[in-house]
């Protein structure tokens, strides 16, 4: 069987609350860092989430 090309990543809040989401992405097709606007329940507003390495 073929090996999967998707890797798990962590999207961490830039608001400094420590909240994060986990997801996966295809790093061969999209090698750049992901940045999304998502809801931070600790800050109670939409903030930017940046991709960081999942430990």
Curated annotation (Swiss-Prot):
**A single GO molecular function, which one?**
structural constituent of ribosome
Q: Where is this region: Disordered?
A: 1-26
Q: Where is the composition biased (Basic and acidic residues)?
A: 1-11
What the entry lists under SUPFAM superfamilies is as follows:
Zn-binding ribosomal proteins
A biological process (GO) of this protein is: translation
Q: Which GO terms describe its cellular component?
A: cytosolic large ribosomal subunit
- The entry's keywords: Ribonucleoprotein, Ribosomal protein
Asked whether the UniProt record includes Methyltransferase among its keywords, one would answer: no
InterPro entries assigned: Ribosomal_bL33, Ribosomal_bL33_CS, Ribosomal_bL33_sf, Ribosomal_zn-bd
Concerning NCBIfam families, the annotation shows: PRK00595.1, rpmG_bact
List the PANTHER family: 54S RIBOSOMAL PROTEIN L39, MITOCHONDRIAL (PTHR15238), LARGE RIBOSOMAL SUBUNIT PROTEIN BL33M (PTHR15238:SF1)
> Could you say which protein family the record assigns here?
Belongs to the bacterial ribosomal protein bL33 family.
Question: HAMAP family, alphabetically?
Answer: Ribosomal_bL33
The protein's name is Large ribosomal subunit protein bL33
Q: Organism, per UniProt?
A: Methylibium petroleiphilum (strain ATCC BAA-1232 / LMG 22953 / PM1)
High-level lineage: Bacteria, Pseudomonadati, Pseudomonadota, Betaproteobacteria, Burkholderiales
